[in-house]
Amino acid sequence: MIRSRTDGQRSLIALVQILGLSVWFSATAAVPSLRSEWGLSPTGAGWLTASVQIGFVIGAVTSALLNLADRVKPQHLLAVSAACAAACTAMLACFAHGLSTAIPLRFLTGVALAGVYPVGMKLMASWSQSTDRGRSFGVLIGALALGSAFPHLIIGLGPLPWRTVMMTAATLSAVGAVIALRVILPGPHLDGRAVIPNPRYVVAMFAERAVRLTNVGYFGHMWELYALWTWLSMFVLAGRNEREDEAAAFTGLVAFGAIGIAGGAGSVLGGWASDRIGRRPAAVTALVISGACCVASPFFFTAPTVALVLFLLVWGASVIADSGAFSTSLSETADKRLVGTALTAQTAIGFLLTVVTIHLVPVAAGLVGWRYAFLLLAPGPVIGAVAMAALPRFPTSTTAHSDIHYRT
């Protein structure tokens, strides 16, 4: 009975993540339509995604400084955040006619999403023991991949107006908010003690070697991940156009397959591996494979479509397979009473890096072409692999040593 309830809550948390995060790349998937309707430039297209990332960072940093994820009932914070993300996306679909309106709304969407993804991690951790936490985080991150890729699926299934795509994503996020409010509950491993705000913990946690190495590994992973997700469809489209290949019409489906299907499967497999063989070897293996894909990407740019798709499936799976290991490792090494704050701070810094690479990739493409643009991402997984290889095999929490104060 207890096991059934645990599995049910995990599944519901993952479902809410898929629904709530479907708004993340909704505007990015609509870029081809917006180019003709708004005269959108590559820089403007980059800002449609980067503004979400910046909003996410601001929201996550604010949440971390206020210890919000540890002070508010997580299911309520999740529901309100998903509803706000839905409202901002719906407003963009109904009222936006250019970047002057779209970018502020995308920024606010990012702020709202800071209460969806990190809080989902906290809730998933509350329903997980250390022996299966990697698998649980893998499922959650697979939900992130599916939700993020969903707009590509909508675009790939037919020539829908971009406003319809945005409204569909907004509706899904609103449904996720209702589910979070009505049926999601915190698990038995959630520390429910009230926390006196201690913003210093955001900095103090980096003093511990295991936490620091885990974070560096995560930052290397993030240097690659979101820039790849943002510009993958452009990479595919440019290569197919150079080949004069009819498969260019199916760019959205290829992107969904690599990001959503392969990414989801890779997340679950990576989470399982982190439980079976350890966080460190699971993360290092994924980082090495995705780094190799970065280096090999120019050779597949104009490869036959079947070869390209197989390559992108491997890359899509490996680029996110290590995420569960990072989240799990941090939840096990950071102060257990402030795990929500630690995860939020880690995520905020990682997403700040994504703003840099999201802007740099199209700049590189303008200089050397899309064939070589993704070489820019290779240093991330290389640095991440080195950091994770140095991680102690059995890192432990530093709760007893942290300068944190509580009300009882």
Give residue ranges: language-model regions:
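C-terminal transmembrane helical hairpin of 12-TM major facilitator-type secondary transporters
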Residues: 279-326
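Extracytoplasmic gate region of multi-pass secondary transporters
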Residues: 27-28, 210-264
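Helix-loop-helix hairpin linking two adjacent transmembrane segments in secondary transporters
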Residues: 139-184
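Conserved MFS/SLC helix-loop-helix module at the cytosolic interface between two early adjacent transmembrane helices
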Residues: 60-96
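C-terminal ends and interior cores of transmembrane alpha-helices
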Residues: 83-97, 289-302
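Helix-to-loop junctions at the C-terminal end of transmembrane segments
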Residues: 60-73, 267-278, 365
